[in-house]
Amino acid sequence: MLRTFRLGGIHPPENKLSAKRPIEELPLPREVIIPIGQHIGAPATPTVQKGDLVKVGTIIAKTSGFVSANIHSSVTGKVTKIDSFFDAGGYKRPAIVIAVTQGEEEQWEEGIDRSTTLVKECTLEPKEIIDRISAAGIVGLGGATFPTHVKLSPPPGAKAEVLIINAVECEPYLTSDHALMMSKSDEILVGVEILKRALGVSRAVIGVENNKKDAILRLSQIAMDYPGTEVMPLKVQYPQGGEKQLIDAVLRKQVKSGALPISAGAVVQNVGTVFAVYEAVQKNKPLIERITTVTGKHLENPSNYRARIGTPIGHLITASGGLPEDTGKIIGGGPMMGKALLSTEIPVTKGTSGILILPREESTRRPMRNCIRCAKCVTVCPMGLNPAFLMRDVQYADWDATEKGYIVDCIECGSCSYTCPANRPLLDYIRTGKQKVSALIRARKS
């Protein structure tokens, strides 16, 4: 019997329209907009000025603390401005704009290996591996964008026992990880070995949902050459890509409220991050591009693109046939955890796993009705929370009750809103309350 996590969960329609599409190369845009805060933690500090010439891989913003990440130029060109632009969350954030040099061959920084030759051997010490990952600006590519070098540096007294690779991709519509697994399986397995070496662990488990049988077969065949690494097929269930849910599915361990995965002896890394680690350590290549799914039921050409960081999302949408006439919303990410985007000028960042074009009929909110106390939201919550009560407490600004209801444990998967027969915007209220309670907790600690 296939494993899955044991608490809550739902089965929304998968709609993996681009599942069989190979990764396509995307033409370069005329300019890129590269935010300096594409990660959890402190924004990077710009190291370039207006008028500076940059190459692919030039560092344009450096870390401003331990929990931060370097930012590199994804193109050859000239810095035209450093200004504030809207991000995927609707906030104005500083970004560096680079006009792409036209009509000339791209210039890359020296030392970057652009070949596709597989490099298996890695003799670096753990600290050297982590330093290379940090220098390359690698962050979690599953959406959380937590700096990878921090994850590979457990706090004193904590010891990793197993590395879990998150290749679940449970979010409907998105197929970028699936496409990457099919095209870069050998590199991913080498990346797993590099991370095992960095953490000092002998065991790794690659968790893949059973709707990706081709990826499971391919990875399993290659994994036979790597002792201590196994591929674990998992039952299809949302939100299995959550760290705590994946740890429960793979290890049968539950991470306590407020605790980190390392408390269960686990470090979890997204499969896209693993490939980026391979490129950083074996090819000296910084994180300047990622695989992004562009999809939607009425989109002419749903695809998986290799997109340079900073590329306006409109450039990707145009490559997929342009916006359909009945477009209602453009979502950054998937339908469950993604956010509506304000403009097609918003750039691809390190965390942009997908761009979803929803038709009007699927993007119009239905009228909210009174809660009928059916408890469906409680049943499906993978964190064991009571979303209905949390929404009520947020409405009344009862922050004490909200905190006692463990609102900060919410992983914002949206299962509660999805299943609510009264169309109540549970997640919207919980997100608001979570921000407020988190701010109150930080204020108490300071």
Where are these regions (language model features)?
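N-terminal, Lys/Arg-enriched amphipathic/low-complexity engagement segments
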Residues: M1-T47
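Short, well-structured beta-strand-loop connectors
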Residues: Q49-K62, K81
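Conserved hydrophobic positions within beta-strands
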Residues: G77-V79
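Acidic low-complexity segments
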Residues: F86-F146, G157, K213, E230
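Gly-rich Lys/Arg/Thr-decorated short loops/hinges at beta-loop-alpha junctions or inter-strand turns
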Residues: G140, L163-D177, H298
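Histidine-anchored nucleotide/phosphate-binding helix
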Residues: M182-R197
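Hydrophobic alpha-helical positions that pack around
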Residues: V201-I313, A319-P324, G334
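Ferredoxin-type iron-sulfur electron-transfer modules in oxidoreductases and energy-metabolism complexes
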Residues: T352-M368, V378, P382-S446
